[in-house]
Amino acid sequence: VYKRQPMNRTYIQHYKSLFTLGIPIVIGQVGVIILGFADTLMIGHHSTNELAAASFVNNMFTLAIIFATGFSYGLTPIVGSLFGRGETSVVGRMLKNSIFANVLLAVLLTFIMWVLYLNIHRLGQPEELLPLMRPYFIVLLISLLFVLLFNAFKQFADGITDTRVSMWLLLGGNVMNIIGNYIPVSYTHLTL
């Protein structure tokens, strides 16, 4: 007869550590999804053409941002390993290297996205959407460098097990984004 063993205290401690570390990461990832959802919801109440233009541009940038996020994920295990061994001076160098690499990637992605911007009229979208797409595209293009810098710092913070900082920054960014969207959507004379 199989007798169920009581859960070992070590396992319980591991589960607690895992949840303490992982829940802020999950909340932060949900925050990224909420960011896009809030944009879509607010623009959708304004006009169908603006929603179509924003959706197209957002999808173009999603490809670049997912690529950049995947690139930045490489830092977390390196920093985590060094931090776990107490090699804090090397951890700092890894952050500097990551910032440099992410800035280089931002320059490359900005160039690629700029080429797409110059050729947006060739991507088969209705002519009436192009004047709506262009200013929004430029705003997202300007923000690309900041997204990559944030990714570098977020992955560094995750690597040193400080996952709450990036979670709060993402949630705070959502609040600022909603406020920032509300003004031009509600007061159309302030839009680009």
Functional labels for PLM-detected ranges:
Residues 1:
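Active-site loops and adjacent core secondary-structure elements that bind or stabilize anionic groups
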Residues 4-25, 79-145, 179, 190-192:
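Short alpha-helical transmembrane segments in multi-pass integral membrane proteins
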Residues 15-34, 60-67, 142, 168:
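Residue-level signal for short hydrophobic patches within transmembrane helices
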Residues 27, 39-43, 54, 79, ...:
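Hydrophobic/aromatic residues within transmembrane alpha-helices of membrane transport systems
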Residues 43-62, 128-132:
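Interfacial/gating helices of multi-pass transporter permease domains
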Residues 164, 174-190:
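Membrane-interface helix-loop junctions in multi-pass transport and translocation proteins
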